[in-house]
Amino acid sequence: MKFGLLGRTLGHSFSPRIHSALGNTNYELFEREPSQLQEFFANPELQGINITIPYKVNALEACDVVDPRAERIGCVNTMVRKDGKWHGYNTDYDGFVFTLQHAGIDVSGKECIILGDGASSATVHVALEDLGAKNIVHLSRKTAPFYGDAPNYYETAQIIINCTPIGMYPHNPANLIDITQFSKLEGVVDLIYNPRRTILLLQAEMMEIPHCDGLPFLVAQGVEAANHFQGESFGTKEIEQILRDMRREKENIILISMPGVGKTTVGKALGEEMGRTCVDVDHELEKEIGAISTYITEQGEPAFREKEAEMIAKFGTQTGLVISTGGGCVTVPKNFAHLRQNGRIYQLTQPVENLSTSGRVLSSGGIERLRELEATRTPMYESFAQCIIEHNRNAPETVAAILEDFEANLL
């Protein structure tokens, strides 16, 4: 018996990992063209398949028996062969409902906006109806109301769900609408999971509004599909364990601090402890521009900051890294989104009297210059950081403190 994921262009998929974690190691990826679908569905070796874009409607049409909820939504993402007949389900529905619960977002009686008009948006619409949403509006590129009509809902919308790929890697940090203008907003969901935090979610985080990316959606729908495939009753426990493991593997750890605090040392120690690649942004820059002090002297600090921002943008799109930044990266506001999109940011601190200025052109001038820098930059560091760690030159203790916080904030 074969299980797997059907799509036209799959690339990297988390689905095999999800199903393997639930005991199904016989899960494959099936890339097929539209002309191959009839033959594919007729393959007697197939026992269960998940379906992704663009074949969810085709899957519904290929089913002999369709679950009423999937029929209502108008598409199928899970097919199981029973007694020689294909039975179709929509477990994306379950994934979305779990995501709302996971984020603590209550849609009952709320005014909701869905961005997009594809298969996922149809699923989300039905789920919102079933959960008692008061009113549901779709904003679209193709038909009215359009994305540009978002201002019409600034005073009424309470929940926003993005069902489009806008903002997904490698096109991050693109964004459809500015949610900071919505005065009654209570919850935001973005079904994108790479990056973990799109601009939409970074804005929600800044506004201190409950929000969630698409990874819980992906994992929960996969677990519900596995229940159909394997006849099991997997639930929240399994979803959260898989989600935690994937977060642990993917979330970057970002180190920021005053120059000379010890980011490089701590970063290397973290990399060794976690078995991760440690990226030192200053070292990567020097491979490209030569000595930083010379570059700043000859080209000026603004030119250097632009080079630094380009390097941060490059590594910020990647996952599973430890990233040690330069001391002044926080002076460029756009660096925050590039660092935070896939990472948790840690500010390392220690008394300014302990800091070295050797070889650091921007902090030369002794203790008074360092105090000036500290006074200017401390609010910037604090605005970037999710956690502040006192580093007393004991790298193992600092690493342990970071890892304790990291583990506690995976979900």
Label for each model-derived stretch:
Residues 341-380:
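A glycine- and Lys/Arg-enriched "phosphate-lid" helix/loop adjacent to the NTP-binding pocket
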Residues 2-103, 195-197, 201-203, 207-210, ...:
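Phosphate/diphosphate ligand-binding glycine-rich loop within oxidoreductases
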Residues 240-248, 269, 273, 379-411:
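NTP-dependent small-molecule kinase module
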Residues 283-337:
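ATP-dependent small-molecule kinase phosphotransfer cores
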Residues 191-251, 391:
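Adenosine-phosphate binding glycine-rich loop
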Residues 146-211, 329-335:
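Rossmann-like adenosine-cofactor binding region
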Residues 131-147, 282-289:
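NAD(P)-binding Rossmann-fold cofactor-contacting core
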Residues 7, 88-93, 100, 109-129, ...:
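Glycine-rich adenosine-cofactor-binding loop
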